[in-house]
Amino acid sequence: MSSEPFTADAHDTIQVRGARENNLADVDVDIPKRRLSVFTGLSGSGKSSLVFGTIAAESQRLINETYTTFVQSFMPSLGRPDVDALRNLSAAIIVDQERMGANSRSTVGTATDAAAMLRIVFSRVGTPRLEPSSVFSFNSSEGMCPECEGLGRTDQIDIDELVDRDLSLNEGAITVPGYGVGTWYWQVFVHSGLLDADKRLADYTEREWHTLLHLPTTKVKVGTNSFSYEGLIPKIRRTYLTKDREKMQTAVRAFVDRAVVFAVCPQCEGSRLNARARSVKVAGRTIAECSAMQVDELAAFVACLDEPSVKPLLDGLGHTLDSLVRVGLGYLSLDRESGTLSGGEAQRVKMVRHLGSSLSDVTYVFDEPTVGLHPHDIERMNHLLLSLRDKGNTVLVVEHKPETIAIADHVVDLGPGAGPAGGHITYTGDVAGLRASDTLTGRHLDHRVALREQVRRPTGVLSITGADTHNLKNVDVDIPLGVLTVVTGVAGSGKSSLVHGSLPAHEGVVVVDQSPIRGSRRSNPATYTGLLDPIRTAFARANKVKASLFSANSEGACPQCKGAGVVYTDLAMMAGVASTCEQCRGRRFRPEVLAHTLRGKDISQVLAMSVVQAREFFTSGNARTILDRLHDVGLGYLSLGQPLTTLSGGERQRLKLAISMARQGAVYVLDEPTTGLHLADVDRLLALLDRLVQGGDTVVVIEHHQAVMAHADHIIDLGPGAGHDGGRVVFEGSPAALVADADTLTARHLRAYLGR
């Protein structure tokens, strides 16, 4: 056999040449394949631009191009990243923190295929015998509850919130968002020929009311066109009520909250299944009971089943359930709706899909996989990342936690700063070399926040009594006012249930979370924070013109792109294309608006500035006050005109905090504010939290980061475990007392962090 090396063996590195996506500064870097590579650097240094925006994006674009144009029309349109060359790419699988599904029919069980395996087990060995397996699916007509149609809940719709009985259809009697006069839905009702469009609804007969509200889907013909007519209530249920509430448009969500009352389905008691499916048992349990069990309990139940005829299936199901437990999700149940998962939980559920995969030589791309994980769970996550690597895969991880950086085979550090000051490779190599380097990450890798010895004295308390949301066990606890309180515990211990389920009801509480900021692609930090108002006023005064000229959403908008900066072209069966507007060249404004300047800059140039640059430009007034708040929360690198849709969860939370900081004497509730923060940024966050407390505010933080725990005045630790094993307060007191006296999981890891 020849000893000559195979030519294919030379392709063992991903080669990036001349990457310029976003703030990347002509980056050249080689990344070893079949290794675990961790990308570090400040928030905004260019990590995601390199990993997601360049490497993963190009891999997915090349794969998508192998499909027919018909198939591509149903896939997202991906442009080629701004890079000179990318070599030796393998197929990329992105495991990010985007929430899963906008549909109530998607659950943890359906997302991981555990529900499908469980259905087959029940169809094969259940008593009485019932086949096929679709009989046990709430998404199948054979298995769904006839009352709630497989949703597990019923709805009562207030008819008077749907229509105005004093008007006719032509006068706009239907008051549902999207059904106004002239809309497509309105035209279907008016031109169907089934209703008198000029007759007041108050004068409708019982038959006409039935046709308007309840008629099942019916084919109607208008001229030469045929279309489907459906009663208003079934149409609303189908188009609105099956969606995740958080994914609804603002007007639709407000309408649903106003017009619809939801309740657990009385017929299936929330199980979603019909009586036949609920009658079948395996080892004394129905499939509904199994789906409602905690995953760790279900894993133990499945392991005890002795059914040789379905042993391979039980092994596969057991492996999936054990994987969920290993990623710290043992407290979930298979019937938990996917849309209710946090970003970190959603990412770990996606990860489980790939752990049992037969694929090899794939590139897995992770975005902060430790988000939402207690230090106790991070070690288990690290083992899973290493197991993916050991199957011959390339694992690329964007991460800030030292525990995960420590297991890397290869580290790529970007910086030296954020935004325009970032985008350069400051270090590549192993972890030991990073620790010895003089980069910001290297200097902070072993940095430890000192334990707060002298805690601040509270000015009062907010009492929570009898809290029993989700897994809480009738918890009574006092939240001290005027200090920094950190609520800790493993994932699923009840932290969010305690804080979010009890505190928002109190007056003066400001909840600053990581949920998506609602708005269009035109929304940006300048519009969201109100910064654009003083900027427009300054331009108007300097040029003696109307302030409305300097809005890309009204008078000042480019007529070609309507102020969007891009023109969207529909290519029928092929994917639509967004191209930079030729008239305004992406600047969004009319030429005559851009002719007006403020200290030598036009409005588009100001909106292109980062927060840091804008602080130097606006040295006083309301604009400077808002910019200072954005800088204080660590968003100095953000561009004023950057679309809000591009922000991460951590960035969204800090943007909301910047808006809320103007309030005095408030109680701020923050959910994992260290998400997305570099080790150096954590120090800045702690200084900000201290300033809020010193200004008379109260800060309550749900957090896993040991640096925040050590810096707290008061700690409330929940546990001792997750799910049924959690829901109790296992410690209350100062960080020093936690380290000295407690034996909780949090105490052990905080002691290890402090080297005690």
Residue ranges of model-derived segments:
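Conserved phosphate-binding elements of NTP-dependent enzyme cores
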Residues: 1-756
